[in-house]
Amino acid sequence: MNNKGFNNPLPYIFIVFILSYFSYEIYSKNIILASFYVVSFFIFIMYFKGKYIMFILVLFFVAALNNTICFYNYTPKEVEEVRITEVKNYYGKGEVNGRIVSLSNINENIEVGNKILVKGKFTENKNISNGVIGDYKIEDYKVLKSDFIDKLYKRRKYVFESIESKLGERKAALITSVSFGYKGELNEDHKELMKNLGISHVISISGLHLVLVYSVLRRLLGVKLSLILALVYVLFSGASAPAVRAYIMIVILTFGKIVKRNYNPLASLSLAGIILLLIKPYYIYNIGYVLSFLATLGIILFNKDLNKKLYKLPNSIRNTIAISLSAQILTLPIIILYFNEVSLNFIVGNIVVIPFINVLVVLGNILIFIVEISSVFNYIMYVCHYIIKYIDIFNVFLYNIVNFEGVK
């Protein structure tokens, strides 16, 4: 039995969780392939790590698989509470105990964030990769009293509309998308702008956003209150997989300091991944989840060495380039496969544009609290207007000197 390298078991357990979730979908299509896939993995583990470790990992595999089966085989009752997550015409999506259901016969007055009591007919229609367990044909419904989550969503919409009234839809969408993930109004031009600059990750709330917000809060308010407010921010931003991942890692880091334990970023990343997959197994197919974990893993594995190799550069530039490159090493292949194109300007974009995006993130989040104070609000709008103007000018400049068609 070879226990060497098993002092940090969480990465192995995380891999086993990933294996179990992929196996579940493959099993539904090809039993033989799924069986071969799983057996081969555990033979590999037994050969290199021994029977004892293989047995432990098999137990975790069974637990993860059982969790997945329970998740997808849940049958909603005839009357259920549903949290609305998407509305489009008379159709939409909602969450029932963490599972996603497709909804039909939705009234146009229902908004994202509403919690409704639904009476209807449920039909099983699984879409494993999207977390959908079936379709709900609404026969009758009642909008329940607005709760904390619903109030957060209403606040997001109100802040967006306030910014829109001053700067227009385009700039408002950019500010709210980079600040707290409200990107429903973000048009293709802005998405293309971020792609051209190689910084399209900023239009989704990620670890970058949360760490920035938490760092500012911690300096102003201390650790305990900052953790609470950071959690509210995660909920306010829609609780995306990257944001939740970052929050879990921040909590682990903070707790480790309290109990005076060394922080292991790889174990922390793995634990965050396990927790997220336990709650929502379909995250394994979520591109935001995948890119977030691969980017963080790349930083953990390569950032230190890249920093050393770039020692001749000034600290701020060296750190930015090292983080950008290390994050791209593992994510670039996925981006090319998933989006079928990639901008090679991510280094320039991260050095020149990201600092201004970070200012937008901070200002956008300040707006959440002061949007009703017209004098302060108008001043922030003035600053945001010129920041976006600078980003636009820089994008045009790059466009004129570099081929932005990407890698096809």
Would you name each region that the model predicts?
Residues 8-10, 26-32, 197-209, 236-249, ...:
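Membrane-interface micro-motifs in multi-pass membrane enzymes
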Residues 1-73, 396, 400:
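N-terminal leader/targeting segments
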Residues 112-134:
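Flexible glycine-rich surface loops and low-complexity tracts that mediate binding to linear polymers
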Residues 14-17, 242-408:
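Internal transmembrane alpha-helical bundles of multi-pass membrane proteins
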Residues 139-249, 254-255:
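Aromatic-rich juxtamembrane segments at the membrane interface
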Residues 96, 127-149:
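OB-fold/S1-family single-stranded nucleic acid-binding modules
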Residues 97-112:
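Beta-strand/loop nucleic-acid-binding surfaces
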Residues 73-90:
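Structural detector for short beta-strands of small beta-barrel domains
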